[in-house]
Amino acid sequence: MNANSTYYLAQFDAAAEADKFALVRRWMDTEPLPFFKELREHRPILVTPQCTLLTRFDDVTEVLSLPKIFTVALYAPKMGDYLMAHDDDALHTREKSLMQGMLNRNDLPAVRSMVANIARNLLDRAQGQIEIVNDYCRMVPATLVQDYFGLDGADKKDLIEWSYWNQYDTFHNQPFDILSDEKRRLIVARHDETSAKLGKYITELMVRRLLMVKAEQAKNILFSLWYGLHKLLRMLLGKQNDSGLKDDMVSRMLRTSFPDAVDFDIKRVGINAGGLLIGAIETTSQAVAQVIQYLLDRPEWLAKAKAAAQHDQTDEFDGIVWEALRFVPISPYLFRRTASEYTVGKGTDRATVLPVGSHVLPVTQSAMFDAQTFESPDQFIPQRNWYHYFHFGFGSHECLGRYVGMVMIPEMVRQVMRQQDVRSATKIDFKSGPFPERYDLYWNSMH
């Protein structure tokens, strides 16, 4: 295919209007890099019947910097009143700032050590063979959700399921996802079912942990005596008593007294605790599984990753992981809806007017291959400029827990790469869905 050919666009233009987006969706899912390259070169803003794709770095960053115009309105019916469903308003600014303070970046060395220990224990117990998605990629972040975020007292499999269906409905059940009506109803039903269970759990968690905080603070002797009776009753009923408060996110939030004017009461604490869970598990699992497969499929970079994984200094290894994610991101795009008419690429030959209510896909994977920003974009070059990656989003809706993810994701991959002769017999099985569901790995166990 020469530089002037338009293999994809020729088919797109020739297709019937009703068939155009199905073609686009198929190419995005099965051959994204050559498709996006052609768009960047020949039609960087592609208008389809369902949505508009933006493929240049400058256009992607422009729209993601305008949250009141390019909104997350499509999140709102799925997320309820969580801060990420709000666009540049008081609640979003206030709660994201509060939560970023709680997620103290000074914790990160300890968080990475925690992740490493969890990961090593799982791999050691596996003794050379593991189904990595369910027994590792999901299990490590689920354990961190309990131990660091403080969502204890629930089965890890429940935490995983609650995260899974929230993520599925919010990010993969949108107008530009090609699904049957039956499948859409199933996703919504499972989301509703798991959200009800999550809500009940969060309520119980808040009550239980608030009692512990109040007793710890010894606000009054009678309350401390009551809490002692509560523990005795649990013991007599055969229930495990809490061993005391640890330093985790839930404890930090409940230990902190906020003035009424800050509007961060126990209900808001609970909503934000649930948000930590939902955002942590499935995204991490997908990123880790896909990076592992990417490296196993490329002997040159596998060898370099395995060598770097042995070093205590992790910068070299982490750079390999982030560059791999450029090629296999958890999603090739973000999505927004316009609240007002806007011209993207104004003053250029690609200028396009987007009417109110347009669905817009800033194609972040394509932006990470834009030669205007990424030198030699088709080459695998670790240690690129971190700020040009979109692995945790961009702008006001950049991932709340990105700094946790920045140590958790590479450390999980690193522990796998430290295993002797790690290998896979098959590709990741997505089971016709958006997430990795099965991926069997083997290595030479020392046990």
List each language-model region with its residue ranges:
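Cytochrome P450
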Residues: M1-H447
